[in-house]
């Protein structure tokens, strides 16, 4: 009799459990749908991967710290007499330019210190982001700041110095300003020059930013990729 009662109780329990699952709301909320922006980012990263995949096997991947060390050391290999020019566009708080300055005699940093000149389209930052209200950060002694909008300062600098440009760290973020800089400096760039982009790939809007400016200024046969940052958006090319 006891065994029969136990079977009956188990049977009733299964019925009640079934009724609960069908009639009562689930205690687990349904999975959230991706927002349009999240879907956009996901598709951008996938498209970015397919675009850069052919270059990955011919380049190296480094973490953020080693990436910056690699690009400046690679540029130094092309400057036997330490007479070539090293430029950074987009200084902001001076972190990278101070790092690069430890490897070279002089490095020039172009920045208005008033933030982005235009909206960062395809991404999340509006005009004016990174604004320091014209206040310069602490810079090493061999860092020479070129203060003002690059559209006003770059051409006079090039005309006055006739530089042999061996290294460019491009951190202007947006397409318009990056395109302006690349177009103006291209005639002064030497063979094997390293151009490092701080936001070239691996983020939403990559295709309409620095990458677009690069593709419109240089032909594919004029450069090769040498390094990608494995945990960031940075990538570097070397002029052939």
Give, region by region, the residue ranges found by the protein language model.
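S-adenosylmethionine/decaboxylated-SAM
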Residues: 80-240
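Membrane-proximal basic amphipathic "stem/tether" segments
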Residues: 1-59
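Active-site rim elements
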Residues: 55-60, 201, 205
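A broad, low-specificity signal for short, low-complexity segments enriched in glycine/proline
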Residues: 45-50, 65-71, 157-159, 201
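Short secondary-structure transition/capping motifs
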Residues: 60-64, 89
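Conserved alpha-helix/loop element of class I SAM-dependent methyltransferases that forms part
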Residues: 65-83
């Amino acid at each position: 009799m006891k065994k029969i009662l136990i079977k009956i109780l188990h049977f009733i329990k299964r019925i009640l459990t079934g009724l609960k699952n069908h009639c009562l709301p689930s205690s687990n909320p349904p999975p959230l749908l991706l927002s349009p922006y999240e879907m956009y980012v996901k598709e951008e990263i996938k498209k970015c991967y397919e675009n850069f995949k052919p270059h990955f096997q011919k380049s190296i991947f480094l973490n953020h710290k080693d990436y910056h060390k690699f690009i400046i050391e690679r540029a130094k290999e092309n400057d036997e007499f330490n007479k070539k020019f090293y430029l950074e566009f987009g200084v902001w708080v001076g972190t990278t330019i101070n790092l690069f300055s430890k490897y070279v005699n002089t490095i020039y940093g172009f920045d208005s210190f008033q933030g982005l000149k235009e909206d960062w389209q395809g991404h999340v930052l509006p005009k004016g982001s990174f604004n320091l209200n014209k206040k310069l950060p602490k810079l090493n002694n061999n860092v020479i700041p070129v203060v003002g909008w690059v559209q006003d300062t770059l051409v006079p600098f090039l005309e006055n110095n006739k530089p042999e440009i061996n290294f460019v760290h491009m951190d202007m973020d947006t397409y318009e300003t990056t395109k302006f800089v690349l177009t103006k400096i291209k005639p002064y760039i030497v063979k094997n020059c390293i151009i490092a982009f701080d936001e070239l790939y691996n983020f939403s809007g990559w295709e309409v930013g620095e990458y677009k400016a690069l593709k419109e200024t240089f032909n594919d046969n004029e450069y090769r990729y040498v390094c990608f940052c494995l945990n960031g958006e940075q990538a570097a090319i070397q002029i052939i």
